């Protein structure tokens, strides 16, 4: 009887030691479960770089950690080919995909074919930083100066008064317009009709050409999701104003 008890104890200790050993499949599944968390830092398998993926709102948000001034991408869920969920921008570009088992594939511009991304750590949600009316005014003046210098003509930037809680979105929108313009500034012929930039308040984000103006509509109460992406604004800048 004593030998039986001793054998059972040895077997139990061995099982406990086995549980403490590395188990790649178990660890992978655990990381995949963590990817499903509402907000967290994910790490690219190819470069080791991190990005924050926030799904705490109706639209998901994504920002790369090592580029604090980079654009926060607003992503909308859609069914992915073959199953899972694809998160796409307002121009239809897929940025990240989650499988049914929780695995993540990231599609940055630098790796359009996709790279594996693993959960790294929890993170807080993303929200525009609070701004003052003076900061918004200064950012608008900076944008007007940048566009005027690039196009060799006077450019006016106007914006509708936003509630104090929406000033952060308004400031960020000016930054996003600057990114959009920088991406198409070489298209001087197609930009020759642009003389004004107007930021208006509305119920949903939009951007379009109207005569000599670029009109960008924002919904400040929606946070980052209340403004269009730089890619969407770039398309509007290069569009035919007569088509609106």
Task: Give short role names for the model-derived ranges.
Residues 141-244:
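A eukaryote-biased signal for long
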